[in-house]
């Protein structure tokens, strides 16, 4: 069937392939959309094109659109809705478009789980389930699962003569617990659920152990895996020998070794012609390999030492490969290998039945509770859609309803999901209506049991011309990244990806081509930053005395230094929205890593460089101090007889005991529970610690009672309130994050209580299980998407995102091979494999099946890691920076050189398949770039033609020891000071510091004037300023005055504090009558009771001085006009700078603030009164002398008050008075004169 595609409009921006993907019809379609190729836009446009075409008569509810996440589904629905509204605005009379807008909310645009839920809700009777079921979260599902599994195992243990089960327990558990069996059943259950028929898969798993009719290992279904692995290792050994021969053949090479090496190679070549029909023949051929001893070199000085060592190294590597083949595949007789499998068959059958029983019990328990979990949705939908292995009537109704089924991220589909989708699509081969979009090079979810082979099978079967099984369309044009990023990605992956190792070829159809339009730049070359961790032979012990930095720390510092340079140098970034270059911002940079283990080191390095940083970590929640403390406290409330949690709480800020006090508690009762010792210590000891313990015991008892009466969240919040722990952690470094973590604990407890489980005990047990299983929770998120910070995230978390600058870190970190070396291995094709345990002889050894599946899983893991690296490289829009540490760059580069002289573009499969980290791949590819050849000055390197721009930096770890060395020097400086010796004035930042210190700001005068000042401060300044002074001299006399805390005010008060107390009383005293001494005493007593004044302040107040004011003429006026008196009047007023400072010609203003003690506001005038507590009597010869000083001191203040009040009220200030309590003196201020 050919393609039927309308001609592309002349003015369209779509590429030919994009247009084809939008318009193609008539068959199933697979769109292989490379990174950044605009697949979402193509998918949305295809949908819109179909919906706006009124001749096609397609409604939006006749489409099934499946996305990978709920967020993607919401975005898809939003885009479609927006496009429909735009189309309707251009054609407002279209009833068809109006109908589509109305139907959009009913359209099936969702994740597959959501679609399955819709099927179950509509057709629950077909699955024989209660329609009122509740969908539970994984948290509740895991708790039900654990209970059901424990009940199942308890039942098996209780059955008499249950020999098969007990043999299984002995074979698959440790000496003390059956936790391994518990976990194995759970793993097998989860794995089986990724298959359309879990029970059938479990039964087939048993069949792989049936070897009665198998006479040779070559007849085993997984023998091709074994054969491929042996061939791979033989080829690797051959490659090593060819390298050895090359070194021996060099001028000054160890030529006497050549005869032995060529004999080795001849033997290896004979292994390439093995007949694989007979296992014993293969074994004999490999065992016959005889590596002769290489001859001794008579005159060693005639030979290049490096060539000799490299020749030996490569030959030893070849010998090791052959030895490993013998150990892994031929260490036991063929009959024993086959017998092992037959002996294990009863155990495999028993565990298969256990898993099936558990699955039934688990589902029945959920049914009893009226709940379903997410794993149930797909299988129940499948049960509804498939009856007796054929599509049910429900499935046929969906086939009629959906004119097209569109699937995004198809590469991450598993077998169950594939079966469901095929059941709701058109079953007629000539009318395929399945539209799949994805990129198998970005399939990185195998750990979630995604099956990329589904995509790859269709990719190979479908044809670009539309003939055959379906239509294949390749979208390779990248609209995200600069050419420099694409060239780097292509250069690396043309050498790495092919079907043998990566499960897909990186050919012309797969390579990335430029589609984005960026302005030219000379700054965007891909950078490879390698830090050589080899120690400098010339460095002294003193230089290394600080603790040697770990690899993560060194690399983090190198990255932080790089970022700081980019920010400081205003690295240019093209802003697509502004359509112009701008300086780089922190938010433009992301650091990607395979895992987040280096995040703490990265955060520390960023702090040193003053770089705002955020790491989105999905683990470590339970390890945070604040959460660990709260969990420990909850455990103690549940049961105080738990020594470790109790000690943690006592040592925490909640109680605040130190180590010595904890030791004294234990001495109070040396044996038994620590809680008993705590009670004993409390009763026999009189101390501050005993008081704190007594208070804690009281609180603990109250909390224990509360945990019974109230729900868990009420308990947690009560603890936060009573202990102030929430506020306390807020004051610690990272307080915002810590408080968010505590809120998250409250929220998670709330979420827990919404399940069928209740109570503190079960919650604590649930948390313990999470910790044991390693199912940690991520720390609470406190960062918004738009905050200007450098972000760090995993490569998986970055999928689908893009960033201007991407730094890929930790490239030398080893791949996580933990699953591969597990005792038990699971595989979709061959089921379950483990080592064989001979219970009678107490011997454990690997089975042939375990070895085969181990190799298969290893190859799958390598293929997935290669795809993860592809995802990482393709996140960059403009610049790509690759960073790694190497133990010894000279030795590492020599390893890379072994393949640098080959002519083929693709690297040998053995090199790619045996990689231990991303740097193994990157190093072996980048070394064939001209930049690396120039760096190493190595003529043997066969460079590959490329336009890739590469910048290589090799740095030593010493470059990043600065902090430790500077701390070390600082210690020496301290010693110099103690010894009264000069401190050396040397610094790596000397020039930079001098530049900063000598910098002169052009508007110095403006910096001497505060933008906001109090009247009191201005008064002090003017008392110091005269005709020859300038404002800068005032700084020498300015002093910050802060209120002392109240507990310090309990002692002798300062003059300022006494004045404050007097003013407070004058503000509170009634003016409706003349107060008596009794009135004032009563008022002061009331103010103390209300905590307005302290006892010390009241004692400092002279009541007779207060009464003296009301006896004065000024006081009498205040009493007479009390209804016009305003007290403590605050004001703010803008005053020209030139009016304050005679020498200033600035046109700026200063905001002055003050408080008028008292003012009498009449209709046309205002009288100001300011109270003073200055010492007068006995200090001056007479009042006249005192008055002169006081006028000079306070004139500026009162004039500022007057000008401000006049400007604010619009009334003239006619009089202004100072009243001095000491001596009852009244001083009138002349406010007519200027400043």
UniProtKB/Swiss-Prot annotation:
Keyword Magnesium in annotation: no
UniProt keyword terms in alphabetical order: ATP-binding, DNA damage, DNA repair, DNA-binding, Exonuclease, Helicase, Hydrolase, Isomerase, Nuclease, Nucleotide-binding
Keyword ATP-binding among UniProt keywords: yes
Subunit structure of this chain's protein: Heterodimer of AddA and AddB/RexB.
Entries under PROSITE patterns matching the protein: UVRD_HELICASE_ATP_BIND (PS51198), UVRD_HELICASE_CTER (PS51217)
Cofactor: Mg(2+)
Known role: The heterodimer acts as both an ATP-dependent DNA helicase and an ATP-dependent, dual-direction single-stranded exonuclease. Recognizes the chi site generating a DNA molecule suitable for the initiation of homologous recombination. The AddA nuclease domain is required for chi fragment generation; this subunit has the helicase and 3' -> 5' nuclease activities.
Matches recorded under NCBIfam families: addA_Gpos (TIGR02785)
EC number: 3.1.-.-, 5.6.2.4
GO CC annotations, alphabetized: cytosol; DNA helicase complex
Catalytic activity: Couples ATP hydrolysis with the unwinding of duplex DNA by translocating in the 3'-5' direction; ATP + H2O = ADP + phosphate + H(+)
Binding site for ATP: 33-40
Gene Ontology terms describing biological process: double-strand break repair via homologous recombination
InterPro entries: AddA (IPR014152), DNA_helicase_UvrD-like_C (IPR014017), DNA_helicase_UvrD/REP (IPR000212), P-loop_NTPase (IPR027417), PDDEXK-like_dom_sf (IPR011604), PDDEXK_AddAB-type (IPR038726), Restrct_endonuc-II-like (IPR011335), UvrD-like_ATP-bd (IPR014016)
CDD domains on file: DEXQc_UvrD (cd17932)
Domain named UvrD-like helicase ATP-binding: residues: 12-482
Alphabetized GO MF terms: 3'-5' DNA helicase activity; 3'-5' exonuclease activity; ATP binding; ATP hydrolysis activity; double-stranded DNA binding
Annotated UvrD-like helicase C-terminal domain residues: 509-800
Protein name per UniProt: ATP-dependent helicase/nuclease subunit A
Entry similarity comment: Belongs to the helicase family. AddA subfamily.
